[in-house]
Regions:
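Conserved active-site alpha-helix within GNAT-family acetyltransferase domains
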Residues: 117, 123-157
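Conserved acetyl-CoA-binding loop-helix of GNAT-fold acetyltransferases
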Residues: 96-111, 121
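Short active-site oxyanion
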Residues: 20, 113-119
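A short, internal acetyl-CoA/4′-phosphopantetheine-binding micro-motif in the GNAT/acyltransferase core
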Residues: 88-95, 124-125
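Short amphipathic alpha-helix that is part of the acyltransferase structural core
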Residues: 5-47, 64, 161-163, 170-195
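A conserved beta-strand-loop-helix scaffold within acyl/acetyltransferase catalytic domains
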Residues: 47-59, 65, 71-82, 86-88
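Short hydrophobic/aromatic beta-strand or adjacent loop that forms the aromatic wall/cage
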Residues: 58-60, 158-165
Length: 195
């Protein structure tokens, strides 16, 4: 598990470059915003403000290469049993180097350390998450609170992101399969069509 006080160093590219995963601090806000908002400008992620990242900075992990931030991701709690992996961004020049995978592994380890039963994400790349043990689920099966960010998204009425879920506790998996909101922390939302 990632310690809030010490980083987790990993060697990538055959040992040529040192990567460090650590909890984000206030000094990381500007580079986090740069990463996230570069993708937001392409319509791939929701834009974030300095206030939002400041408010949620404890949710974030960052990954550094040669002292420079090359990736970030956050674990946001919704219920005592489920959290969302969000704001996952990797610098363009560092894609396909395992940074996204390492961030997901670190965030999942952090979720397990908090005894969460499951984590979910909204994504355009479900294949990547599938390789990390996530399964596609219906959006309406996720916690109602997860939709608060969706309300400000320009694609809210015609969302094309895929919901994915990774179960960390097999007992939770049984509850999830039976769609029992009382035990699973999930809420079934009705499907509303636009006319």
């Amino acid at each position: 598990m990632i310690s809030a006080l010490t980083g987790d160093s990993i060697a990538e590219y055959g040992g040529r470059r040192e990567f460090t995963v650590r909890k984000a601090g206030m000094h990381d806000i500007a580079p986090i915003l740069d990463l996230i908002n570069a993708y937001a400008a392409k319509g791939i992620m929701l834009p974030r403000t300095e206030f939002e990242v400041s408010e949620d900075i404890r949710d974030f992990l960052v990954i550094l290469a040669d002292g420079r931030m090359v990736g970030c991701g956050a674990l946001h709690f919704y219920t005592p049993s489920i959290g969302e992996i969000r704001s996952l961004a990797v610098a363009e020049e560092h894609k396909t180097h395992g940074i996204g995978r390492r961030l997901i592994e670190s965030l999942v380890a952090e979720a397990a350390g908090f005894a969460l039963h499951a984590v979910f994400a909204f994504t355009y790349v479900p294949g990547f998450f599938s390789k990390m043990g996530f399964q596609e689920v219906e959006r309406g099966e996720l916690p109602l609170k997860a939709w608060k960010d969706c309300l400000r998204c320009p694609k809210f009425q015609c969302c094309d992101e895929i919901a994915v879920l990774r179960v960390l506790d097999s007992a939770y998996c049984r509850d999830f399969q039976h769609h029992d909101p009382e035990h699973s922390g999930l809420v079934q939302l009705p499907v509303v069509g636009i006319k």
